[in-house]
Each structure stands twice: as structure tokens, then as C-alpha cells.
């Protein structure tokens, strides 16, 4: 059995918009804490202006996977983008397109990490 936790637990505090720790720092902290597997929380790093929202997101994902490998943390789970059902009642077609695009991107990222 592996013991795992999510990078999302290290990135922000109480789901605030501000990220207090980078994914790299979260991975290192999780390894130092003694976990032997990891959940990459792509949704935490996918808001506007964060790495999973950038044009070079694939390069960022590759670096995170390499960092996990360096710390002997197999990626056993990933969290994709999700949205509030209540908020979705107000979505425009562009909002839906953006949300579906983020979900597809996160699924691809999970595949890149062999989840």
C-alpha cells in the first residue's frame, strides 16, 4: 500500500486565489514528509495566470513529473479542473468552452504523468 497526498494541500490556503507554494515546493515537502506517492492537483495550478493556464503548460507538467521522479514519488492520481454547478447556471457558451478545454487539458496532463 502507498500513502499519498495532494499537491493541492500545499499550494493554497483554504482555496484562496493566492498560491503560497509552487508545485515544485509542494512535491519536495510531500517527499520530505515521508509520503511515497503523490496526487498532482492540476486544478490548483490552473486558474488564470498560473502554470496550467499558460501556453507552455505541457513543459510545466513535464517538469513536475520529472520532479516527482527525482523524489521517488509515483503519480498515482491527478485532479482535473471542475466547476461549481450553481455557477454553471450562469455560464455563457464561452464559459463552457473554457471549462471543457481546461478539463481536456488536465486529462492530457494526467496521461503525461502516467496516471
Model features per residue range: what roles?
Residues 1-115:
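N-terminal pre-domain/capping segments
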